[in-house]
Amino acid sequence: MKWLKQLQSLHTKLVIVYVLLIIIGMQIIGLYFTNNLEKELLDNFKKNITQYAKQLEISIEKVYDEKGSVNAQKDIQNLLSEYANRQEIGEIRFIDKDQIIIATTKQSNRSLINQKANDSSVQKALSLGQSNDHLILKDYGGGKDRVWVYNIPVKVDKKVIGNIYIESKINDVYNQLNNINQIFIVGTAISLLITVILGFFIARTITKPITDMRNQTVEMSRGNYTQRVKIYGNDEIGELALAFNNLSKRVQEAQANTESEKRRLDSVITHMSDGIIATDRRGRIRIVNDMALKMFGMAKEDIIGYYMLSVLSLEDEFKLEEIQENNDSFLLDLNEEEGLIARVNFSTIVQETGFVTGYIAVLHDVTEQQQVERERREFVANVSHELRTPLTSMNSYIEALEEGAWKDEELAPQFLSVTREETERMIRLVNDLLQLSKMDNESDQINKEIIDFNMFINKIINRHEMSAKDTTFIRDIPKKTIFTEFDPDKMTQVFDNVITNAMKYSRGDKRVEFHVKQNPLYNRMTIRIKDNGIGIPINKVDKIFDRFYRVDKARTRKMGGTGLGLAISKEIVEAHNGRIWANSVEGQGTSIFITLPCEVIEDGDWDE
């Protein structure tokens, strides 16, 4: 197949066309040359024979004038023999007016003398008195040759007295033509050989730049734009090669710009905080960034090529064609396991002609925003509820007092006591809300001090131990002093809140344990406060630090809690670069863990 491909190449075609043109040209020239040469040689031959015959005619006329027709036979024979010495003459006969052969130059035909010649051309010449000629094939001993027969009548006093019959060997002329044709054919063959060789070189000068451009085109199709076509001259092909090099350079620059823009676009799409999905005009997903995959919780191969509306679970809502008309956004639950909510906006990729080539979906994660909004609504609802409950209670007691209960010496003090307790609870609630608001706005000032934590925690435990006679406090505190830096007032609030909750929810033989451990490697310490209370269900442990969250709302409200204590504690601990969390087993108790940074202070570091 390689030879067939080579045969079909432009290089071979140019050589073939070049050779064919040479062959056609030489054939035309050869045909014209040989035809004219043949005509010229034949005309010259016949002209010579005709002149020769004219001379012989004149000589015979003289013989007849001198000796008459009876005594002229011998002289005519001698005269014919004299003229027959030429090589091209085959035979000469003289035939009288009665078609009787008078003389002949050929020895083998001497027996025909005085016999009648039965030749139509002779008869025609004698009867018409005009010369004629024709070609015949005759064997002179070496095979049949072409012979030109020429008849010329002899006239004396304008009367035909006889006819000169001449057979001339015209075959030599044709042999000469054949030799010339053979020379011409050999010359043509040599010329063709030289033409083929030169044709290959000439065609190569034309096809080499074209081949280079073809190879460069193949390289360009593979993404290689660095090669350049060699320019061999200033002709049209050279100009084409120059234009091709300029085109290759511009394509290379355009490709580089396109690749740069593509990389930039890929980088932007990859690192966008929003999910991006791009489809073809049929809605099949072709591009998806990492954020979108993360939102769906799927691998790339599980989403590429799938129908976008099916992936978004919107195929029952509307059709793909409606995206172009509908600019509304949608809230979708993309990942139910993680509770991820995204706002989806669609846009259409449209050409200038109006033809739609694809669609783009932008997924904006609004989970946190929705959660904040939900928490805000819950917060407002909780605050409203927490304020409405004591206000309703206070309003009822005040109305009772207004209606005369103040006169009852037993009820009036009770009503006033309940009103005061509810007022104090509202004050605590408002104070907690104000403190949380300051922390949210980062306007709550923290005054840190270097604190001996051992002394600090023991002082708090002692205070609670004195007021809670029914609770046992167990201490596991290192003897080595642990120094830390925090705001003592705010951290006191944290530990008071945790210890109070531990005492509130303990049951039976109430017991609160304190465990303190230091990790010098990380300059951290961990405080664990454990009770033997009712415990917290495992699915609610992480929620106890949320605002207004209560595991047992009725019991918490009965004990005077606002539901904000642990939320405030979490804000304070995190403001000190710490962490607070809980572990609990329902029915066995709860452990609150607090980690805080601690300071490594040597004895020489204290100022005297």
UniProtKB/Swiss-Prot annotation:
Residues 382-600 form the Histidine kinase domain. Zn(2+) binds at H271, D274, H364, E368. CDD domains: HAMP, HATPase, HisKA, PAS. Residues 204-256 form the HAMP domain. GO terms for molecular function: ATP binding; metal ion binding; phosphorelay response regulator activity; phosphorelay sensor kinase activity; protein kinase activator activity. It is a multi-pass membrane protein. Keywords: ATP-binding, Cell membrane, Kinase, Membrane, Metal-binding, Nucleotide-binding, Phosphoprotein, Transferase, Transmembrane, Transmembrane helix, Two-component regulatory system, Zinc. It comes from the Bacteria. One of its GO terms (cellular component) is plasma membrane. It is found in: Cell membrane. Autophosphorylated. The keyword Transmembrane applies. GO terms for biological process: osmosensory signaling via phosphorelay pathway. Residues 314-378 form the PAC domain. InterPro entries: HAMP_dom, HATPase_C_sf, His_kinase_dom, HisK_dim/P_dom, HisK_dim/P_sf, Light-responsive_reg, PAS, PAS-assoc_C. Its EC number is 2.7.13.3. The modification Phosphohistidine is found at H385. The keyword Methyltransferase does not apply. PANTHER family: SENSOR HISTIDINE KINASE GLRK, TWO-COMPONENT HISTIDINE KINASE. Member of the two-component regulatory system WalK/WalR that regulates genes involved in cell wall metabolism, virulence regulation, biofilm production, oxidative stress resistance and antibiotic resistance via direct or indirect regulation of autolysins. Functions as a sensor protein kinase which is autophosphorylated at a histidine residue in the dimerization domain and transfers its phosphate group to the conserved aspartic acid residue in the regulatory domain of WalR. Forms homodimers. Forms homooligomers. This is Sensor protein kinase WalK. It comes from Staphylococcus aureus (strain Newman). The gene is walK.
